[in-house]
From Swiss-Prot:
Transmembrane segments: none annotated. Belongs to the transferase hexapeptide repeat family. Its cofactor is pyridoxal 5'-phosphate. It holds the Pfam family Hexapep_2. It comes from Pseudomonas amygdali pv. tabaci (Pseudomonas syringae pv. tabaci). The gene is tabB. Keywords: Pyridoxal phosphate. InterPro entries: Hexapep, THP_succinylTrfase_dom1, THP_succinylTrfase_N_sf, Trans_hexapeptide_repeat, Trimer_LpxA-like_sf. CDD domains: LbH_THP_succinylT (cd03350). This is Protein TabB.
Length: 276
């Protein structure tokens, strides 16, 4: 039986697994988590323009919590103790490992094991959870959170205090997806499986969930759960037709990216200049 089939079958019986069965699951689970760390296994992939969730990844992660015990994390000067079932990704890394990975990690960045960080990425003091994927040349700015299984593409800028929601349960729910070349403004939140398509610009303080109306100012079209490619989106509100005097939060597509917008959100290659 393949590791995938073994884990799929074990997940269906997760409440009845014996101690011996859990011990036998450790090697395939550790193999799977290592594949997540290398970016070979992903919680979601684009297939013909549509993002498809791989539920196996969530089952793998959830089962790993059954096979591990909480332990005190290794401490270094200035780092508080932790008590968790997962180690931190960089806990055992040395200078050579960081050079090989071609990433920059500022003090205060916390990345749990099982997350993938691609070459050229820059991590300011942020939190990145298990199963997350961060693409090449992407910056995760200060106090931002990339939730479990969230997918962030290449050459994105995730500004300070942004929250990208994670999802492990329900199993079939899609994770948040941020495609390539996206700029997300400070203190924005993207959650509940929302997809932000390539090249979009999300303004400061925009909240996007599955039920958030995304209104195109030019056409009046209302959509949910997906920001179109190259859209420029800001926070807005609209009147509640059933209750005059009350307005409901929404997001507004004010235009599509032009050269003026792109110049304001252009990435600075100097901060990504890592020798390879």
């Amino acid at each position: 039986m393949s590791n995938r089939a073994l884990i799929e079958e074990a997940f269906e019986r997760r409440t009845q697994l014996t101690t011996e069965e859990l011990s036998a699951l450790v090697p395939p689970i550790e193999t799977g988590l290592a594949a997540l760390e290398r970016g070979e296994l992903r919680a979601a992939r684009a297939q013909e323009g549509q993002w498809v969730c791989d539920t196996f990844v969530k089952k793998l992660i959830l089962l790993s919590f059954l096979t591990r015990e909480n332990t005190v994390g290794e401490t270094n000067p200035g780092r508080p103790k932790s008590y968790d079932k997962l180690p931190l990704k960089f806990e055992q890394w040395d200078d050579a490992a960081f050079r090989d990975a071609c990433i920059r990690v500022v003090p205060g960045a916390v990345v749990r094991a099982g997350a993938y960080i691609a070459p050229g990425a820059v991590l300011m003091p942020c939190f990145i959870n298990i199963g997350a994927y961060v693409g090449e040349g992407t910056m995760i700015d200060t106090w931002s959170t990339v939730g479990s299984c969230a997918q962030v593409g290449s050459r994105c800028h995730i500004s300070g205090g942004v929250g990208l929601g994670g999802v492990l349960e329900p199993i079939g729910d899609n994770p948040v997806v941020i495609e390539d070349n996206v700029f997300i403004g400070a203190r924005s939140e993207v959650a509940e499986g929302v997809i932000v398509r390539s090249g979009a610009v999300i303004g400061m303080g925009v909240y996007l969930g599955a039920s958030t109306p995304i209104i195109d100012r030019a056409s009046g079209e209302v959509r949910f759960g997906e920001v179109p490619a190259n859209a420029v989106v800001i926070a807005g509100n609209r009147a509640d037709p059933k209750l005059p005097g009350v307005s409901l939060a929404c997001a507004v597509i004010v235009k599509y990216v032009d050269e003026r917008t792109r110049s304001k959100t252009a990435l600075n290659d100097l901060v990504r200049a890592l020798s390879r």
